[in-house]
Amino acid sequence: MSEIKLFEVGTVVKERTSSTVVLEKQLQTTIEQNMETFFGVRFLKSEYMITSGRMDSIGIDENNSPVIFEYKRSSSENVINQGLFYLDWLLDHKADFKLLVIEKLGMEVADQIDWSVPCVICIANDFTKYDVHAVNQMQRNIKLVKYRKYGEDLLLFEHLNTPVAKPVTETSTISTTSSTYTQKTHLEKLA
């Protein structure tokens, strides 16, 4: 992907060189402490344990939709698949998320959780063009955010895609038609 260049303009113009964080946890801590400022998401929990892993960070956005954050220091790691796995888990465990929201933000917010467009924000130092194409094909609310660090005091976030997500709908396999069965009807089916 293309590289953003940052310049310090003074008496002499000087390019600021970018870098990545040394440890993924450094990036995670900075974002968790400033999640609402950076992304408009209220922070709920770090290292949220689930049955088969842990989500790096979890929060709730201004529309009361769940937001999962996954961080990777480099682009070669499997952040998108991991985020999708956690999203599916979350949709199957809504009650667990609601309890977390009650604990952190209260019942009023928990009663307003919007499950129609939950979000995964994947943050890494880069993504391939194939990553961007893949998430755009999924029709899920997955955002790819590239980060760059400039010195100790500047952090840049570049949003690489604008997801066009289909709302998650509740599907039911229960028939809505009612039928009256008698013992004779069941015996006829067995014959």
Each predicted region: which residue ranges?
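Charged, terminal alpha-helix-loop-beta segments
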Residues: 1-191
